[in-house]
């Protein structure tokens, strides 16, 4: 290392004299020392103050320029040397050298800039300010189609530099590269050089960095990236290499156009093959790959076009294979199968076909296996399927007679909000316009008590909202006195009154219709609860508020008329001077509201 100190002193003097021969000797010594012990040599270089000297040596006409760039590339392998390289003013002269015609200068300069950018925000910012990215993108464009070894070497270095440059938490550098049109160039490069492992890997990492950005998706969609990635994926045997392709596929597959391209390029068949190969393995990496493949499969089904293409009228091979995952003993496959079915069940035609072909029984069997200490994600996914399947009118009766309500009610004791939410949604869909089922459920005291409890789940707005909506639905669809009595006895009335003040018009309306039925069918039973929940005051507010939707005003007036049958509520109506508010509504632009206002006004006048 004494030798190194001499070299550094000599280099300082030589740098001033610019005698290329002795300069070259000094640089060779440095490179040798860096090969033997990079870290220690780099520390010495930093301590010697020679970095500033390097800036003056990075000149296009010198025969030593490539070696200087090589020394910088080597020292920048150390994290602690990157900011000193920036501070020494090396970036600007290095970026200037990117315009050189000398292959070796370009190669070493690309390495130096790439290493300085690695994991260094300061390095990337300096390259950005010096305009380095655009020059590198232009080089990639012109070299892209060349397959000679020297060009491929350069391509690998420049690709590596862009990979490090784009690996920034701040999106602005990635957005800048996208605007420079780097994506089509990299996709073309991947297609031409797919046999070259190092180049391919760098392309993939750069894609991964760019694919997270929404603005990149359109550019990717206009290339043949799907075809190239699937081609590459099929070739990979090693787990790590496949993982790299997966990391690009997942963010890209969030875009519907790319989903369809991936499906058309045969990705689904590859994924199904992986599932088949890995399903019985207990190796950690195989389990991880099975999860990635099945998750990606579900993601592809989130696009309407890609989903329909794979459904093929329920006859498709993919649909059949996914169906076979549900009875599997592998939790990950059960989950992916249920999520996939939930995605297929996004249109009525598919839902009707699946119910007619026995999907409900398969899902109920799956749920049955997860009742006691079951897998929450599987429960949630299976309930999501049943909820979607229950949307078409023709499916409701079939699902009810298949025993879906009984299967779903087994999860009433669940303490997991996602499961509670889907359970409520499924029941609400099932009883829509099904009077008998609504009555049966509405008289189920355990269910109604649980609903009332969940109506107070303030930490889980979704569960709270769905509980309220199901309470209202039980009344609206059953129109049953017994159901109303059960809800009154369980303390549900106050929640329906609160629901009438919801910020969602649909929920307000459902509450008002249910309350009108209560007032028409069981006013005596509910009277005290309606009073203590301050229903009359709330109705006055809804009618007086100009922001209330027409249907809210209409149903509020219908409800006021229905409440007149109760002495105490009637008195509250009189005390609040409803006539003033209602008479103003006679000139409302909505005809139904205006008409109902006239009727309500007459009723109020007669009863006063």
Curated annotation (Swiss-Prot):
Gene Ontology terms, MF aspect: guanyl-nucleotide exchange factor activity
First and last residues of every ARM repeat: 89-131, 171-212, 348-391, 392-432, 480-520
Primary residence: cytoplasm
Sequence positions bearing N6-acetyllysine: 231
UniProt entry keywords in alphabetical sequence: Acetylation, Cytoplasm, Endoplasmic reticulum, Guanine-nucleotide releasing factor, Mitochondrion, Nucleus, Repeat
Subcellular locations according to the entry: Cytoplasm, Cytosol; Endoplasmic reticulum; Mitochondrion; Nucleus
Residue numbers spanned by region Prevents binding to prenylated RHOA: 122-171
Post-translational modifications: The N-terminus is blocked.
Intrachain disulfide bonds: none
GO biological-process terms attached to the record: CAAX-box protein maturation; protein localization to nucleus
Tissues where this protein is expressed: Brain.
SMART domains in the cross-refs: ARM (SM00185)
UniProt-listed InterPro entries: ARM-like, ARM-type_fold, Armadillo, RAP1GDS1
Assembly and oligomerization: Interacts with RABL3. Interacts with RHOT1.
Primary role: Acts as a GEF (guanine nucleotide exchange factor) for the Rho family of small GTP-binding proteins (G proteins) that stimulates the dissociation of GDP to enable subsequent binding of GTP. Additionally, appears to chaperone the processing and/or trafficking of small GTPases containing a C-terminal polybasic region independently of GEF activity. Targets include RAP1A/RAP1B, RHOA, RHOB, RHOC, RAC1 and KRAS. Regulates mitochondrial dynamics by controlling RHOT function to promote mitochondrial fission during high calcium conditions.
PANTHER family assigned: RAP1 GTPASE-GDP DISSOCIATION STIMULATOR 1 (PTHR10957)
This protein's name: Rap1 GTPase-GDP dissociation stimulator 1
């Amino acid at each position: 290392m004494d030798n190194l100190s001499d070299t550094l002193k000599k280099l300082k003097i030589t740098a001033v004299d610019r005698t290329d021969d002795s300069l070259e000797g000094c640089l060779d010594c440095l490179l040798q020392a860096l090969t033997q012990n990079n870290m220690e040599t780099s520390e010495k270089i930093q301590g010697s103050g020679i970095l500033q000297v390097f800036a003056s040596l990075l000149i296009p006409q010198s025969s030593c320029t490539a070696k200087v760039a090589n020394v910088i590339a080597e020292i920048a392998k150390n994290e602690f040397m990157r900011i000193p390289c920036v501070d020494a003013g090396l970036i600007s002269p290095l970026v200037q050298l990117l315009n050189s015609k000398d292959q070796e200068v370009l190669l070493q300069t690309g390495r130096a800039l790439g290493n300085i950018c690695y994991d260094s925000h300061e390095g990337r910012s300096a390259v950005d300010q010096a305009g380095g990215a655009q020059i590198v993108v232009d080089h990639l464009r012109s070299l892209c189609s060349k397959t000679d070894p020297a060009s491929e070497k350069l391509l690998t270095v420049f690709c590596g530099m862009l990979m490090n440059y784009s690996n920034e938490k701040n999106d602005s550098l990635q957005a800048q590269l996208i605007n420079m049109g780097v994506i089509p160039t990299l996709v073309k490069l991947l297609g031409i050089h797919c046999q070259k492992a190092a180049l391919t890997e760098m392309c993939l990492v750069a894609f991964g960095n760019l694919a997270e950005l929404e603005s990149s998706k359109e550019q990717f969609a206009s290339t043949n990236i799907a075809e190239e990635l699937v081609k590459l994926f099929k070739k990979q045997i090693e787990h790590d290499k496949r993982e790299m392709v997966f990391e690009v596929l997942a963010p890209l597959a969030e875009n519907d156009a790319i989903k369809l391209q991936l499906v058309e390029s045969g990705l689904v068949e590859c994924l199904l093959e992986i599932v088949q190969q890995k399903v019985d393995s207990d190796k950690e990496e195989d389990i991880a790959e099975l999860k990635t493949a099945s998750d990606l499969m579900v993601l592809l089904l989130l696009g309407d076009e890609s989903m329909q293409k794979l459904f093929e009228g329920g006859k498709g091979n993919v649909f059949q294979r996914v169906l076979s995952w549900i009875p599997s003993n592998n939790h990950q496959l059960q989950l992916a199968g249920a999520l996939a079915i939930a995605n297929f069940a996004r249109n009525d035609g598919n839902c009707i076909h699946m119910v007619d072909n026995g999907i409900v029984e398969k899902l109920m069997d799956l749920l049955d296996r997860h009742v006691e200490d079951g897998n929450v994600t599987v429960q949630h996914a299976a309930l999501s399927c049943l909820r979607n399947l229950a949307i078409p009118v023709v499916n409701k009766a079939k699902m009810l007679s298949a025993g879906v309500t009984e299967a779903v009610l087994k999860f009433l004791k669940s303490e997991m909000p996602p499961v509670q939410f889907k359970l409520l949604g499924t029941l609400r869909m099932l009883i829509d316009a099904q009077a008998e089922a609504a009555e049966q459920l509405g008289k189920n005291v355990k269910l109604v008590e649980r609903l009332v409890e969940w109506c107070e789940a303030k930490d889980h707005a979704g569960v709270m909202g769905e509980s309220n909506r199901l309470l209202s639905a039980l009344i609206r669809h059953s129109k049953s006195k017994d159901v109303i009595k059960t809800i009154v006895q369980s303390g549900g009335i106050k929640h329906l009154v609160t629901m009438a003040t919801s910020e969602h018009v649909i929920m307000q309306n459902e509450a008002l219709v249910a309350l009108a039925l209560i007032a028409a069918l069981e006013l005596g039973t509910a009277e005290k609860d309606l009073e203590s929940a301050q229903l009359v005051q709330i109705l006055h507010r809804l009618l007086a508020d100009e922001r209330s939707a027409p249907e809210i005003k209409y149903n509020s007036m219908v409800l006021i008329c229905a409440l007149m049958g109760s002495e105490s509520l009637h008195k509250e109506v009189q005390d609040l001077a409803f006539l003033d508010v209602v008479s103003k509504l006679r000139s409302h632009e909505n005809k139904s509201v205006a008409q109902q206002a006239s009727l309500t006004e007459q009723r109020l006048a007669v009863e006063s």
